[in-house]
């Protein structure tokens, strides 16, 4: 029978000092011997997705203590990718994932916690905590802050839905008046919560449901809705159940590595492809899999991308649907239910909400469940009132959206497309693969041949786009922005937004060893691996080169001869210490970022640390 980890610091005369300190935190005499549950919160006033989380730890703690545990809360950092975007701050976003992961490990192991509740929400916080949870392999449950309500405003006598990307595009589009741009800006992000489309934060929170690590509704229930309160309370109760199962009954199925196993990662990626999730999820799932010692790779993602249809289309891929609409249609459980009926998921996977995913779907999939409480749960809707407060409204749709033919979530035979929402491309320019969010690409652009317009940084690319250098038919190449080369693998939302603002969103392609915001749409191909700084072919592309992209064939090719490519590689290597470095780029890189770059791997490995460099 596993012994409580916390006994290390609470039992025995030699731990008198530790117990004295525990007492100073509020632990009572009769508390010693109870499991200590760590609550990793990520409250910050910098991020709208986290601004309302301050009191969430107390909610979870109360439920834990009622169930017989000791709850101890700590905080992690949280970077807002939208605020950090478009300047040097974005260099810190992806590296913060590793910092969050390490900080959770440090706190949990330093204090010998027995189990963990992760209160996350935005882009790097959920994956960072997930990496830590799988590294630690103690009972865990995730509960996020929830999505933001979609923005709404009236323009040209028409009510339209909005999100962050609309504000960015309008702000860069000279055709939009100052008045309209300001109106869009003021309306785009009306409430607390993670940005309202299927961007990275919401994608990752949805994937925790498919991995079996969070409760139904975690990814879709609005941050503002009163019903979300119960998710936090239930998370506290469930973590105590998982803790009891493991420590008192030696039930290893309660551990995250047995829940989030290979089949669960396949389920998560299948969901991601079906809902057209952010391409960043690929990066984070690969990283989490490595922490959990799960052999899940780009090859598995490529295989699944050829099998899974696109069942749910959400902003930024369409202006019609946002996360509030996904929730009304049954949320993640609704999508998983359709995938299950299509025979595309492993329904025997363990899940924190029940014995198996099949059991969970029987209750929570509105297409098969007649439970009135479940239908009421998914009827929770927006209020349309600006607020930074959680649980501030209790509005409901008149009915759930159970239309699986023409609704937000569809049956396989009525899918938005039989091709899924994400695809892996490979070729001589990306030998180890790259990622495109096909959900956001017009079908007319699934094959594209263009002339390379090469930039050594995102800043130069932005200047080139806004300065008129980029024209229809160009393939914008932004390199040396990978995990090592940036360092930090910046998101390229501004270049893609500016292409749209110049009317080039469907007339150009963009490829990069950097990554894209979940808000990106258009023919935007990221995660090119190996990256330029690691000797990847993208570092050898020259302006004017012909680049051929074929999504149906899963191909991306630099159309030069092998002889010419070899000659360019030799010339690059001859540059000595300056080889595989951006020519003429001036960028201030802090010591912290340099340390990150030393161990960073390319995107096909999840941009995790190269641990071989740490071996004796």
UniProtKB/Swiss-Prot annotation:
PROSITE patterns to which the protein is assigned, alphabetical: ILVD_EDD_1 (PS00886), ILVD_EDD_2 (PS00887)
Keyword Chaperone: no
A GO-annotated cellular component: cytosol
Residues that, per the record, bind Mg(2+): 81, 123-124, 491
Amino acids binding [2Fe-2S] cluster: 122, 195
One example GO MF annotation: 2 iron, 2 sulfur cluster binding
Known cofactor(s): [2Fe-2S] cluster; Mg(2+)
Transmembrane regions listed in the UniProt entry: none
Pathway noted in the entry: Amino-acid biosynthesis; L-isoleucine biosynthesis; L-isoleucine from 2-oxobutanoate: step 3/4; Amino-acid biosynthesis; L-valine biosynthesis; L-valine from pyruvate: step 3/4
GO biological process: isoleucine biosynthetic process; L-valine biosynthetic process
Protein function: Functions in the biosynthesis of branched-chain amino acids. Catalyzes the dehydration of (2R,3R)-2,3-dihydroxy-3-methylpentanoate (2,3-dihydroxy-3-methylvalerate) into 2-oxo-3-methylpentanoate (2-oxo-3-methylvalerate) and of (2R)-2,3-dihydroxy-3-methylbutanoate (2,3-dihydroxyisovalerate) into 2-oxo-3-methylbutanoate (2-oxoisovalerate), the penultimate precursor to L-isoleucine and L-valine, respectively.
Quaternary structure (record): Homodimer.
Official protein name in the record: Dihydroxy-acid dehydratase
Organism: Shewanella sediminis (strain HAW-EB3)
Gene: ilvD
